[in-house]
């Protein structure tokens, strides 16, 4: 599943081709995605995309009269191609542009989405109650301590709640907790301010590094130019259950926590 770094890499890849460009045509081959693609998406035609932004894992194509909201779901990907490039299996939507390019959404598992809203993007029901972006100053140790106070929820589950902070998905929660030396099952409200400060710093470092490396390619994700992400080569714990910890050589434990695979070092993480 594409997480925040993968979505940000996609945003960076498509933005130069879309920003300041008029939409000439929207082709919906199969609109049966997570939510049906609305007929109103055709309102995008003849509008100029002024900005390609991201909120959590949503990509926002912003115009003066509305916003197209894209979500990649479990297996979605975007490509910038020349108009006329033949569609392949699972190529569900094309947004054709006045510069001769098109933005193509491919989604084998159909958990992605393409929505249209005339209201400000941040006011949309899917976005309005989300927590802060993890790479902004709004996400800091003081904020996290305030949200965690009195909470018995496991810290990993707590971090993956997008009402607390967006974009800290399973891969990066595993990696950040390992880097911070915090056991994933430790109660969120039972972590000192000093350790939370370390955790926040590691979340920011891990996410920024993943973006710089083009994301993590485990199965489905490739960037807008079709290239894989290389952060997989830097994973310390995720996907390595039963293998030796790189630091202390203890065999890494693998459990299910909040219905998600969780890998940690019982020696290094407390």
Curated annotation (Swiss-Prot):
Keyword Transmembrane helix: no
EC number annotated for this UniProt entry: 3.2.2.23, 4.2.99.18
Residue stretches spanning the membrane: none
Active site: 2 (schiff-base intermediate with dna), 3 (proton donor), 57 (proton donor), 260 (proton donor)
Keyword terms of this UniProt record: DNA damage, DNA repair, DNA-binding, Glycosidase, Hydrolase, Lyase, Metal-binding, Multifunctional enzyme, Zinc, Zinc-finger
MF terms in GO: 8-oxo-7,8-dihydroguanine DNA N-glycosylase activity; class I DNA-(apurinic or apyrimidinic site) endonuclease activity; damaged DNA binding; zinc ion binding
Cofactor: how and how many bound: Binds 1 zinc ion per subunit.
InterPro entries, A to Z: DNA_glyclase/AP_lyase_DNA-bd, DNA_glyclase_Znf_dom_DNA_BS, Formamido-pyr_DNA_Glyclase, FPG_cat, MutM-like_N-ter, Ribosomal_uS13-like_H2TH, Znf_DNA_glyclase/AP_lyase
Tree of life domain: Bacteria
Catalytic activity entry: Hydrolysis of DNA containing ring-opened 7-methylguanine residues, releasing 2,6-diamino-4-hydroxy-5-(N-methyl)formamidopyrimidine; 2'-deoxyribonucleotide-(2'-deoxyribose 5'-phosphate)-2'-deoxyribonucleotide-DNA = a 3'-end 2'-deoxyribonucleotide-(2,3-dehydro-2,3-deoxyribose 5'-phosphate)-DNA + a 5'-end 5'-phospho-2'-deoxyribonucleoside-DNA + H(+)
Cofactor: Zn(2+)
Keyword set includes Acyltransferase: no
Zinc fingers, FPG-type class: 236-270
Residues involved in DNA binding: 90, 109, 151
Gene Ontology biological process terms, A to Z: base-excision repair
Function, in words: Involved in base excision repair of DNA damaged by oxidation or by mutagenic agents. Acts as a DNA glycosylase that recognizes and removes damaged bases. Has a preference for oxidized purines, such as 7,8-dihydro-8-oxoguanine (8-oxoG). Has AP (apurinic/apyrimidinic) lyase activity and introduces nicks in the DNA strand. Cleaves the DNA backbone by beta-delta elimination to generate a single-strand break at the site of the removed base with both 3'- and 5'-phosphates.
Entries under HAMAP family matching the protein: Fapy_DNA_glycosyl
Family the UniProt entry places it in: Belongs to the FPG family.
Subunit structure: Monomer.
Protein name: Formamidopyrimidine-DNA glycosylase
Species: Aeromonas salmonicida (strain A449)
Upper lineage: Bacteria, Pseudomonadati, Pseudomonadota, Gammaproteobacteria, Aeromonadales
